[in-house]
């Protein structure tokens, strides 16, 4: 039987995609819209405080295309905290006009495919930085879920640990070419959501998403074993831009 990869697990992650009921939003009196925006910004301010204390992180992006209008990406130490944040958002006045589009629940993950020493990895600063990341404030985001194929001779889970390690090492070398251009956060979701992993990419140049994903398609681990869900691409919605975004 093949050996399962051991994982290092960090913060829990929620990707919460919503569409905006603009028609209903436009019917609200201006004063009520402003009050709803102020209430939402107060909630975001709480998220900012948590992030400054390094007890979690968040990102808010508007989504390009028809799959969704807005994304709230939240990182927290526990699943319960994610649920509390989702509930708090749903209780706001603004949420009356935010319709569920898609969501993804996962946990920040590092695997043991790369060789490690005897030191406790959770005490290594670089490992901790990757397991408990402060999300980049880049102009653009790209998210997609993915699986490893389990069909015939292309069954990832029947490969030996050494075979999988070698394939992942080559895959990682491709990713390193984009260091400084793209920041990647991998979250594991086996038993938590419909796919096995979520991939979130951050960059100030959206074209780098296309270049990176395309080049990786030629890696054997992706060409033979990668299966992908829908891609979501968006632009950053800073606190300063929230009032103008919701202005009608």
UniProtKB/Swiss-Prot annotation:
Active-site residues? 144
Any matching Pfam family: Chlor_dismutase
Q: Which GO terms describe its molecular function?
A: heme binding; metal ion binding; oxidoreductase activity, acting on the CH-CH group of donors, oxygen as acceptor; peroxidase activity
For this UniProt record, the keywords arranged alphabetically read as follows: Heme, Heme biosynthesis, Iron, Metal-binding, Oxidoreductase
Q: How is the cofactor bound?
A: Fe-coproporphyrin III acts both as a substrate and a redox cofactor.
Q: Which cofactor does it need?
A: Fe-coproporphyrin III
Task: Indicate which residues the UniProt annotation says bind Fe-coproporphyrin III.
Answer: 130, 144-148, 171, 184, 222
What does the UniProt function comment say about this protein? Answer: Involved in coproporphyrin-dependent heme b biosynthesis. Catalyzes the decarboxylation of Fe-coproporphyrin III (coproheme) to heme b (protoheme IX), the last step of the pathway. The reaction occurs in a stepwise manner with a three-propionate intermediate.
UniProt lists the family membership as follows: Belongs to the ChdC family. Type 1 subfamily.
Q: What is this protein called?
A: Coproheme decarboxylase
């Amino acid at each position: 039987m093949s050996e399962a990869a051991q994982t290092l697990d960090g913060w829990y992650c929620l990707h919460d995609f919503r569409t905006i009921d603009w028609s209903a939003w436009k019917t609200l009196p201006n004063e009520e819209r402003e009050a709803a925006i102020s209430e939402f910004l107060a909630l975001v301010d709480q998220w900012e405080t948590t992030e400054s204390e390094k007890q979690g992180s968040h990102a808010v992006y508007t989504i390009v295309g028809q799959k969704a209008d807005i994304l709230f990406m939240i990182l927290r130490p526990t699943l319960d905290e994610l649920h509390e944040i989702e509930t708090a958002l749903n209780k706001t006045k603004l949420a009356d006009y935010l319709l569920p589009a898609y969501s993804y629940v996962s946990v920040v993950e590092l695997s043991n495919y790369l060789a490690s020493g005897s030191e406790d990895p959770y005490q290594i600063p670089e490992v901790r930085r990757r397991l408990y990341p402060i999300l980049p404030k880049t102009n653009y985001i790209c998210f997609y879920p993915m699986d490893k194929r389990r069909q015939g001779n292309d069954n990832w889970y029947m490969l030996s640990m050494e075979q999988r390690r070698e394939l992942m090492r080559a895959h990682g070398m491709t990713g390193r070419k984009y260091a400084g251009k793209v920041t990647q956060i991998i979250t594991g979701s086996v038993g938590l959501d419909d796919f096995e992993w979520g991939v979130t990419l951050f960059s100030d140049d959206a074209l780098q998403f296309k270049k990176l994903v395309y080049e990786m398609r030629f890696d054997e681990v992706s060409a033979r074993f990668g299966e992908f869900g829908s891609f979501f691409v968006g632009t950053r919605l800073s606190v300063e831009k929230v009032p103008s975004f919701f202005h009608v």
